[in-house]
């Protein structure tokens, strides 16, 4: 295929569509419940990238009618203090979703904090209870990025059942839950990772190839089966030889676009979908807590 025939999986456009759907849903639920849905975001320290992500999430909340409760703590905040805040938010009737913005300063135990969140308010879908529900094929709050990938494939009517899917990356944030979601839709799954031998021979088998490894432009055209669906979860800031900064994914976009049938852009692919699924989880909690 030539580069001009590789179609884009436009996450940005779909995220806007989902936001409009959520806006309508909230307008229907608000009179019954008597208040808007609420999302509490906890940020520790002054990581500039995290600050941008939090601001984007708060702006997205405002667009759909979710009230956001920002909680910004200094970098030296203790584990105990944060756990106490989470416990308060668990009990707060205005709050339907709780999000801990990662990464955290090194002295904090992120996993322990995530475990403190009420599973029914777990906006990121990372609590062991919700991951366990995913393993069992039960309904629950799903991890935002993998859920965003699946929703994007669905929107473009990309058939998953019976396909060979390769997920490069095994993190609890993306790789593992996404593999389970693809399996749930009857794909045949391979998970590749840093210890995988002869990675290219595996990725070339993929009808659906997902890159989630955090290595800029790592997946090249030679690693991709012609006509494959390529989903790029990575987002990396690199400095080009001319000194300009650029955001790129884990896939060499220009090269792979000449081989793939579909490809996600970076930015504008999976990033907006992750935020859309976060909002959706918050509204699901809002509806579920009140059984409306």
From Swiss-Prot:
<keyword id="KW-0658">Purine biosynthesis</keyword>
<dbReference type="GO" id="GO:0035999">
    <property type="term" value="P:tetrahydrofolate interconversion"/>
</dbReference>
<dbReference type="GO" id="GO:0004488">
    <property type="term" value="F:methylenetetrahydrofolate dehydrogenase (NADP+) activity"/>
</dbReference>
<dbReference type="InterPro" id="IPR020630">
    <property type="entry name" value="THF_DH/CycHdrlase_cat_dom"/>
</dbReference>
<dbReference type="GO" id="GO:0006164">
    <property type="term" value="P:purine nucleotide biosynthetic process"/>
</dbReference>
<keyword id="KW-0511">Multifunctional enzyme</keyword>
<dbReference type="GO" id="GO:0000105">
    <property type="term" value="P:L-histidine biosynthetic process"/>
</dbReference>
<feature type="binding site">
    <location>
        <position position="235"/>
    </location>
    <ligand>
        <name>NADP(+)</name>
    </ligand>
</feature>
<dbReference type="Pfam" id="PF02882">
    <property type="entry name" value="THF_DHG_CYH_C"/>
</dbReference>
<dbReference type="GO" id="GO:0004477">
    <property type="term" value="F:methenyltetrahydrofolate cyclohydrolase activity"/>
</dbReference>
<comment type="pathway">
    <text>One-carbon metabolism; tetrahydrofolate interconversion.</text>
</comment>
<dbReference type="GO" id="GO:0009086">
    <property type="term" value="P:methionine biosynthetic process"/>
</dbReference>
<keyword id="KW-0378">Hydrolase</keyword>
<dbReference type="InterPro" id="IPR000672">
    <property type="entry name" value="THF_DH/CycHdrlase"/>
</dbReference>
<dbReference type="GO" id="GO:0005829">
    <property type="term" value="C:cytosol"/>
</dbReference>
<dbReference type="InterPro" id="IPR020631">
    <property type="entry name" value="THF_DH/CycHdrlase_NAD-bd_dom"/>
</dbReference>
<dbReference type="InterPro" id="IPR020867">
    <property type="entry name" value="THF_DH/CycHdrlase_CS"/>
</dbReference>
<comment type="subunit">
    <text>Homodimer.</text>
</comment>
<dbReference type="InterPro" id="IPR036291">
    <property type="entry name" value="NAD(P)-bd_dom_sf"/>
</dbReference>
<keyword id="KW-0560">Oxidoreductase</keyword>
<comment type="similarity">
    <text>Belongs to the tetrahydrofolate dehydrogenase/cyclohydrolase family.</text>
</comment>
<comment type="function">
    <text>Catalyzes the oxidation of 5,10-methylenetetrahydrofolate to 5,10-methenyltetrahydrofolate and then the hydrolysis of 5,10-methenyltetrahydrofolate to 10-formyltetrahydrofolate.</text>
</comment>
<keyword id="KW-0486">Methionine biosynthesis</keyword>
<keyword id="KW-0554">One-carbon metabolism</keyword>
<protein>
    <recommendedName>
        <fullName>Bifunctional protein FolD</fullName>
        <ecNumber>1.5.1.5</ecNumber>
        <ecNumber>3.5.4.9</ecNumber>
    </recommendedName>
</protein>
<feature type="binding site">
    <location>
        <begin position="169"/>
        <end position="171"/>
    </location>
    <ligand>
        <name>NADP(+)</name>
    </ligand>
</feature>
<dbReference type="InterPro" id="IPR046346">
    <property type="entry name" value="Aminoacid_DH-like_N_sf"/>
</dbReference>
<dbReference type="Pfam" id="PF00763">
    <property type="entry name" value="THF_DHG_CYH"/>
</dbReference>
<keyword id="KW-0521">NADP</keyword>
<feature type="binding site">
    <location>
        <position position="194"/>
    </location>
    <ligand>
        <name>NADP(+)</name>
    </ligand>
</feature>
<keyword id="KW-0368">Histidine biosynthesis</keyword>
<keyword id="KW-0028">Amino-acid biosynthesis</keyword>
């Amino acid at each position: 295929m030539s580069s001009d025939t590789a179609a884009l999986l436009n996450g940005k456009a779909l995220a806007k569509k989902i936001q409009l759907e959520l806006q309508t849903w909230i307008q229907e639920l608000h009179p019954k419940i008597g208040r808007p849905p609420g999302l509490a975001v906890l940020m520790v320290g002054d990581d500039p990238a995290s600050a941008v992500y939090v601001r984007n999430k708060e702006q997205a909340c405002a667009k759909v009618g979710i009230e956001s409760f920002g909680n910004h703590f200094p970098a030296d905040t203790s584990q105990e203090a944060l756990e106490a805040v989470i416990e308060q938010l668990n009990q707060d009737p205005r709050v339907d979703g709780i999000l801990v913005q990662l990464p955290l300063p090194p002295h904090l135990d992120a996993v322990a904090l995530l475990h403190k969140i009420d599973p029914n308010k777990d906006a990121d879908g990372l609590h062991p209870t919700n991951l366990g529900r995913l393993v069992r094929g039960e309904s629950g709050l799903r991890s935002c990025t993998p859920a965003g990938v699946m929703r994007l494939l669905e929107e473009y009517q990309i058939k998953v059942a019976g396909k060979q899917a390769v997920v490069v990356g095994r993190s609890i944030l993306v790789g593992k839950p996404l593999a389970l979601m693809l399996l749930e839709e009857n794909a045949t799954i391979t998970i590749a990772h840093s210890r995988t031998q002869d990675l290219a021979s595996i990725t070339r088998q993929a009808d659906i190839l997902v890159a989630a490894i955090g290595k800029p432009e790592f997946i090249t055209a030679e690693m991709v089966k012609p006509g494959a669906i390529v989903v790029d979860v990575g987002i990396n800031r690199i400095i080009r030889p001319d000194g300009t900064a650029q955001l790129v994914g884990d896939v060499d976009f220009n090269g792979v676009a000449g081989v793939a049938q579909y490809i996600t852009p970076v930015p504008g692919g999976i990033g907006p979908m992750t935020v859309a699924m976060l909002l959706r989880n918050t509204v699901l909690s809002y509806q579920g807590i009140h059984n409306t």
